[in-house]
Amino acid sequence: IPFIKAARHYCPDLKLWASPWSPPSWMKTNGHYAAASAGEDHDEKYRNGLPKEKEGHEGTDMMIQEPRYLKAYALYFQKFIRSYADEGIPIFAVMPQNEFNSAQIFPSCCWTARSLATFIGQYLGPAMMQEGVSVMMGTMERANTALVDTVLSGSQSAPYITGVGFQ
């Protein structure tokens, strides 16, 4: 927060967006911050303690897809937005998940495009609309237009998406 405030001192019109690397572990199917294991085959500093059998994989959902979890996660976003606003830092947009199609050894969470569309359309989109915050889809690190098309063509999710980000 101090660095953001310092940057805004020099650029008062600075626009900030936010994107989580992972939902809280208790909201994930594997109960771990990471989606891929980093065991004995990795340098000790990268080992994360995730057993191989609890790894996630691209094209699967690691976020628990129950309404109570999805509603709670949207509330996390709202509380984040409000907390930063209380510090004088407006957030103009959020992305529901950074690299949602990648299982990583660091904080990460795979989502299917269909589940992401449901989360945006029924939970995150309405919550962010209440806060006056846009929803962007991203970040996509591989050009898989089918994933984007699924979310952008969803009758519930599409109205909330204001942009798509690729890297």
Where are these regions (language model features)?
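Active-site neighborhood of glycoside hydrolase catalytic domains
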Residues: 69-167
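N-terminal catalytic cores of secreted or lumenal carbohydrate-active enzymes
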Residues: 1-91, 122
